[in-house]
From Swiss-Prot:
Subcellular location: Plastid, Chloroplast thylakoid membrane
Physiological role: PsaA and PsaB bind P700, the primary electron donor of photosystem I (PSI), as well as the electron acceptors A0, A1 and FX. PSI is a plastocyanin/cytochrome c6-ferredoxin oxidoreductase, converting photonic excitation into a charge separation, which transfers an electron from the donor P700 chlorophyll pair to the spectroscopically characterized acceptors A0, A1, FX, FA and FB in turn. Oxidized P700 is reduced on the lumenal side of the thylakoid membrane by plastocyanin or cytochrome c6.
Keyword RNA-binding attached: no
Official protein name in the record: Photosystem I P700 chlorophyll a apoprotein A2
Membrane topology: Multi-pass membrane protein
HAMAP family xrefs: PSI_PsaB
Alphabetical list of Pfam families matching this protein: PsaA_PsaB (PF00223)
Keyword terms of this UniProt record: 4Fe-4S, Chlorophyll, Chloroplast, Chromophore, Electron transport, Iron, Iron-sulfur, Magnesium, Membrane, Metal-binding, Oxidoreductase, Photosynthesis, Photosystem I, Plastid, Thylakoid, Transmembrane, Transmembrane helix, Transport
């Protein structure tokens, strides 16, 4: 008999008489493949419709950002003096605030308590040509409408007559063409248009709005140079080095340039360089979007490209044969590829936002730079771990050995021992040597003989920096040598700006590196290789191992295979993912510690502190963590409070959540079952409480679920603790 209980998508679970019904129901709510009566076509349709919901949420969120800044922020005041005014994210209304708290949080020229924005939104909006609260309100309303349209589109595509067919979802060539040309190409072209028609004129003090955008020419010669082939005209007369952003002082006329380096006043990339970059990207991607064969029988078939990829030496077996069908029929494979790409891009965003700041005055807002770097690195870590999780699910659910005989996929499985053992060897080598150097240096400092430290100059990295034009090290080669052909070739184009930027100590482009950087670089390499080892081993052993050849029959996550098969605990692909996330967090901890400490000393003008203290572990613990958390911990104390108090509280709360994680990670199923049964007994024996009964028999979480709960608390607590530390220690010093 069908039951109406949760979960509706699984009658088997809905009829479970224990609390397992709830926990397992939550666990598989998004595992659409496993739901009752799910067909492949319906699966694709459900996921497709959910994408519209996702986009609606994103647009609503961005609309909210615009709305709150327009309503409660100080965008216009900030635009008048971006260096000295602190940008306001939104007002705070908190009935717990006493007078000291009200005063502490009233800043940025506001009349009451506010939060300061550390997202970089003010800098972005200002750079792209927004100047008034009115601009922000209009953008907010527009995005709210877009959000509503996407919600409607999601609903519409669930209606039978508007549900695309399975063949439409599997038409890879059409999808690639549209995504390359439309998503990347045309959107980049549109962005170039916005930069050229709105942002660049605004940066030169000319307002372009809905009232005059059709009459205000972005370039005095209009389209004439385009039609006559005199494209160089668009690069002539760029903004001068004395240009004051947002005014006509020192402004030029060029719209597409290749100046290199930064705008001296805003310390951000030249807007005209960025317009040129987006135009080039647009052309490339629009061309790329015409590569695959669809309607007119011209262009390439993807399956033909892949089938032709067979190494002539024969050493790679069947090469890419069979990959098209495998990838096109596996959502997990596609998701794995997408997550790996997006994760990598997200990490690249973190690196480039500070080294090549694209937004005006972003380089002057240290707290925002620290927040953006940390945010993008953590997000990248989680996303990239997800890539391997779905890769493992692909091996278990979607991989067909017959279809992939002898190709690169089957060869990965065939020599997985070599792959895993090499990763293991690299991790061991990096771990022992790096830790050995750090510990040796610690001991030397403890014994009062710092001169006996082992300090290794990163000569190869310095050589690479010199090749790119950094003169500090005295390597006379390539771009750091004025006589090299590399230097002379681009001297008139982008080099003057680039060389000026790379040799300027006020920015973060190619920071000077030494022995401390060498050590932490290898510590990070250790973390990356160990994380990769655990994830790759989990995926490559997901179908089976010598110990458990039939592992794939047990699915992605299983606790233990019962009595008589000892040693099958902890070896599911999920267990590998679970372990890898700890290593990922560990690694990103080292990455962000390094970035943050290096920059704190750079911004404070005492780089020697990092250089001298980063070569031994006590230096990191004492001069980075301890020294920089003291202000934060004193956000409130017996003598009062200041504006860091919220971060002090979050720092404590983060530690609490993090510590809760260990409770689930260390004590497993039996402990919880006994505890629950004791609580149930107490409940039943207590007057009043015994009037309340529940139908489900309480059953403790399985070890797989307890690990998820533990991991979630560990991760959330870890991120909250460090986020509070980064923002408080940076804003406490620089405001």
């Amino acid at each position: 008999m069908a039951t109406k209980l949760f979960p509706k998508f699984s009658q088997g679970l809905a009829q479970d008489p224990t609390t397992r019904r709830i926990w397992f129901g939550l666990a598989v709510a998004h595992d659409f493949e496993s739901h009752d009566g799910m067909t492949e076509e319906n699966l694709y349709q459900k996921i497709f419709a959910s994408h519209f919901g996702q986009l609606a949420i994103i647009f609503l969120w961005t609309s909210g950002n615009l709305f709150h800044v327009a309503w409660q922020g100080n965008f216009e005041q900030w635009g008048a003096d971006p260096i000295h005014v602190r940008p306001i994210a939104h007002a705070i209304w908190d009935p717990h605030f006493g007078q000291p708290a009200v005063e502490a949080f009233t800043r940025g020229g506001a009349s009451g308590p506010v939060n300061i924005s550390t997202s970089g939104l003010y800098q972005w909006w200002y750079t792209i040509g927004m100047r008034t609260n009115q601009d922000l309100y209009v953008g907010s309303v527009f995005l709210a409408l877009v959000s509503a349209i996407f919600l409607f589109a999601g609903w519409l595509h669930l209606q039978p007559s508007f549900q695309p067919s399975l063949s439409w979802f599997k038409d890879a060539e059409s999808r690639l063409n549209h995504h390359l040309s439309g998503l990347f190409g045309v959107s980049s072209l549109a962005w170039t248009g916005h930069l050229v028609h709105v942002a660049i004129p605004e940066s030169r003090g000319k307002h372009v709005g809905w009232d005059n955008f059709l009459t205000q020419l972005p370039h005095p010669q209009g389209l004439t140079p385009f039609w006559t082939g005199n494209w160089a005209a668009y690069a002539q007369n760029p903004d001068s080095a004395s240009h004051i952003f947002g005014t006509s002082d020192g402004a030029g006329e060029a719209i597409l340039t290749f100046l290199g380096g930064f705008h001296p006043q805003t310390q951000s990339l030249w807007l005209t360089d960025m317009a040129h970059h987006h135009l080039a990207i647009a052309v490339l991607f629009i061309v790329a979007g015409h590569m695959y064969r669809t309607n007119f029988g011209i262009g390439h078939r993807m399956s033909a490209i892949l089938d032709a990829h067979v190494a002539p030496s024969g050493r790679l077996g069947a090469g890419h044969k069979g990959l098209f069908e495998t990838v096109n029929n596996s959502l997990h494979f596609q998701l794995g590829l997408a997550l790996a790409s997006v994760g990598t891009i997200c990490s690249l965003v973190a690196q480039h936002m500070y080294s090549l700041p694209p937004y005006a005055f972003l380089a002057n807002d240290f707290t925002t730079q620290a927040a953006l770097y940390t945010h993008h690195q953590y997000i990248a870590g989680f996303i990239m771990c997800g890539a391997f999780a779905h890769g493992a699910i692909f091996w278990i659910r979607d991989y067909d050995p017959e279809q992939n005989k002898g190709n690169v996929l089957s060869r990965m499985l065939d020599h997985k021992e070599a792959i895993i053992s090499h990763l293991s060897w690299v991790s061991l080598f990096l771990g022992f040597h790096t830790l050995g150097l750090y510990v040796h240096n610690d001991v030397m400092l403890a014994f009062g003989t710092p001169e006996k430290q082992i300090l290794i100059e990163p000569v190869f990295a310095q050589w690479i920096q010199a090749a790119h034009g950094k003169a500090f090290y005295g390597f006379d080669l390539l771009l750091s040598s004025s006589s090299s052909s590399a230097s002379s070739a681009s001297q008139t184009l982008w080099l003057p700006g680039w060389l000026d930027a790379i040799n300027n100590n006020q920015n973060s482009l190619f920071l000077t590196i030494g022995p401390g950087d060498f050590l932490v670089h290898h510590a990070i390499a250790l973390g990356l290789h160990t994380t990769t080892l655990i994830l790759v081993k989990g995926a490559l052993d997901a179908r089976g191992s010598k110990l458990m050849p039939d592992k794939k029959d047990f699915g992605y996550s299983f606790p233990c295979d019962g009595p008589g098969r000892g040693g099958t605990c902890d070896i599911s692909a999920y267990d590998a993912f679970y372990l890898a996330v700890f290593w990922m967090l560990n690694t990103i901890g080292w990455v962000t510690f390094y970035w943050h400490w290096k920059h704190l000393t750079l911004w404070q003008g005492n780089v020697s502190q990092f250089d001298e203290s980063s070569t031994y572990l006590m230096g990191w613990l004492r001069d980075y963590l301890w020294l920089n958390s003291s202000q934060l911990i004193n956000g409130y104390n017996p003598f009062g409070m200041n504006s860091l108090s919220v971060w002090a509280w979050m720092f404590l709360a983060g530690h609490l959540v993090y510590a809760t994680g260990f409770m689930f990670l260390i004590s497993w199923r039996g402990y919880w079952q006994e505890l629950i049964e004791t609580l149930v007994w107490a409940h039943e024996k207590t007057p009043l409480a015994n009037l309340v009964y529940w139908k489900d028999k309480p059953v403790a979480l399985s070890i797989v679920q307890a690990r998820l709960v533990g991991l979630a608390h560990f991760s959330v607590g870890y991120v909250f603790t460090y986020a509070a530390f980064v923002i408080a220690s940076t804003s406490g010093k620089f405001g």
